[in-house]
Amino acid sequence: LLDGGMGTMLQAAGLKLGARPEELNITDPALIESIHARYAAAGSRIINANTFGASAHKLAGSEYTLEEIIAAGIANCKRACAPYGALAALDVGPLGELLEPNGTLAFEDAVAEYGRIVRAGVAAGADLVFFETFTDLYELKAALLAAKENCDLPILASMSFEAGGRTFTGCTVESFAVTARGLGANAVGINCSLGPKEIFPMAKRLAEALP
């Protein structure tokens, strides 16, 4: 059982619009740890560290380095997990830049950036890596390749689909399932965008694509 959203909890706690949630790992660790602990106490066995937006692009202008933010995020998460025996996941989202040819980010640069993120998570003591809310299968491929090159931790991969059963960039459930597992993901899933009613048929297709 995984945890729930961090962003919504931080908004309820008064996070200002435009603020970087990941910086709270350093500026207000008690708040972050308390949110993790609430999820763990409710029965979550995998807790995602507050590192979803920890990429060079999204942290541009921050006074903290990517490595500092990830180290603090994993530390907060592990402290909250310890009393409950839960696992601390390095939570990784899209980089915030479109890959070529739709954007300007080269595939090799994306692999390098994800490698930096994964190495920081490993150094901080993450128990696993969770790539989530991806809409571009090409970017997820870069992330998974980087993870396999830089760690031997379990890897979870999840994409966000629209009501028609495809991601924003046109990826189908089946293409995602086969590609992600082929690149070493230990588990695959669907998150964000839709509710349980809409996701359930897609989840069935996901399972059927991986006999």
Language-model features, listed with the residues they occupy:
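Domain-level signal for soluble alpha/beta catalytic cores
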Residues: 1-211
